């Protein structure tokens, strides 16, 4: 298992950042890997909600079943189960001037089989190249513009 982390600050408060994180239409704009929400049990990502997302990774079409464990002003935590398992957490902390600090972590857990290992390595390479930090930048920019 490999875990990738990134942290940034935002002029927007935790509620505004959470609104971007839980908006299914915004996912395609900020996700570190291009994915689209195919099916969602609730209008927004919320605690207990489930979603089906799909996209392309390393030239392969992949799909993930997502379960949201937390979605509140403290952050968003979810797990995604597919050819690679992902444990994702965004922590939100208010700062003294009305903004927030946003920390993200993504744990990549490879599954069995050659394809799964290759996709895990591709996911790790994308995250190691700074994609998570760039995603945080897009999240806070959208939250600040709202």
Residue ranges of each PLM-predicted region?
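A generic beta-sheet turn/junction motif
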Residues: 10, 57-59, 96
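Beta-strand/loop substructures that line and gate deep hydrophobic ligand-binding cavities in soluble
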Residues: 79-134
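Amphipathic alpha-helical segments that line or abut small-molecule/effector binding pockets
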Residues: 15-18, 133, 137
């Amino acid at each position: 298992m490999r875990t990738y982390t990134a942290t940034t600050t935002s002029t927007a408060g935790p509620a505004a950042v959470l609104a971007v994180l839980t908006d299914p239409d915004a996912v395609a704009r900020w996700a570190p890997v291009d994915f689209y929400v195919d099916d969602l049990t609730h209008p927004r990502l919320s605690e207990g909600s489930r979603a089906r997302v799909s996209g392309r990774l390393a030239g392969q079409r992949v799909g993930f079943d997502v379960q949201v464990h937390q979605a509140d002003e403290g952050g968003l935590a979810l797990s995604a189960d597919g050819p690679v398992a992902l444990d994702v957490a965004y922590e939100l902390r208010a700062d003294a001037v009305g903004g927030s600090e946003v920390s993200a972590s993504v744990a990549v857990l490879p599954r069995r089989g050659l394809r799964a290992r290759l996709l895990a390595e591709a996911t790790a390479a994308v995250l190691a190249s700074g994609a998570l930090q760039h995603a945080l930048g897009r999240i806070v920019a959208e939250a600040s513009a709202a």
